Amino acid sequence: MMQRCLRLQKPLALRRGLHLAQVNSQAVTTEAPEAEPLDAFERQYLKERIEISPFQRLFLGAGSSIAALLNPRRHDMIACLGETTGEDALWTILDTMQASEEGQRIMADKPRIHTSTIDFKYLETLPPDTFGAAYVKFLKDNQVTPDSRMAVRFLEDPKLAYLMTRYRECHDLIHTVLDMPTNMLGEVAVKWVEALNTGLPMCYGGAVFGAVRLRPKQRRAYLKHYLPWALENGKRAKPLMPVYWEKRWEQNIHELRSELGITVLNKA
């Protein structure tokens, strides 16, 4: 842990053995150690990211948390909150990714989930009990699109930036495997599962403060059914970030849930 803290204190380019002026070209000085090559995602992210000071990070974290609390529909503030408060959790997630073969493949490939990268016409041809077919049905039933996620801008390390990007783009896949809709009750339940599974502070915040805005009837159902179910699944489920979802389209969704330790809530 001490090594990680020391590493975070160094500028990103220096951690990779690069001078700041040479990030885009990946030129390495003769004095610096051999740098780990930047992949396409990392190069693009370093061009577009917004550098902020520790004070600015603290200010943005506090301001975005207040704004998100006052208006949970401010997705820009929720995104900012996730980036300014989630660095420690993301390092832990990175360790989890590197501990599994599937997670290592994700970090090497850095797949993206967009309408331009996923063959949705193919997914529509899959049997209805497959994960891919369930994902398409979820998108249609809830009228959502994978293209709506905000880009990551404030994280220093591009690997952590990819993990935050991955978390955002996989959110609807988590909804799918949990069989939860995108209404407030479903979102709060999913946030609890994500919080316990990833440790991201913004997920805990969304779970706690989102529940405050539930209507009385929703709150009764939440306390009696949804919350116990979400807490149980959040604690029991295997780590979800290292799951290479795009390689699971043809898998039977019931078998996938069983593999991950996930049960579906009986909403009747």
UniProtKB/Swiss-Prot annotation:
Cofactor(s) this protein cannot do without: Zn(2+)
GO biological process: ubiquinone biosynthetic process
EC number: 4.1.1.130
Pathway participation: Cofactor biosynthesis; ubiquinone biosynthesis
Domain of life: Eukaryota
Membrane topology: Peripheral membrane protein
tRNA-binding as UniProt keyword: no
Role noted for this protein: Lyase that catalyzes the C1-decarboxylation of 4-hydroxy-3-methoxy-5-(all-trans-polyprenyl)benzoic acid into 2-methoxy-6-(all-trans-polyprenyl)phenol during ubiquinone biosynthesis.
Family: Belongs to the COQ4 family.
Protein name per Swiss-Prot or TrEMBL: Ubiquinone biosynthesis protein COQ4 homolog, mitochondrial
Organism: Drosophila sechellia
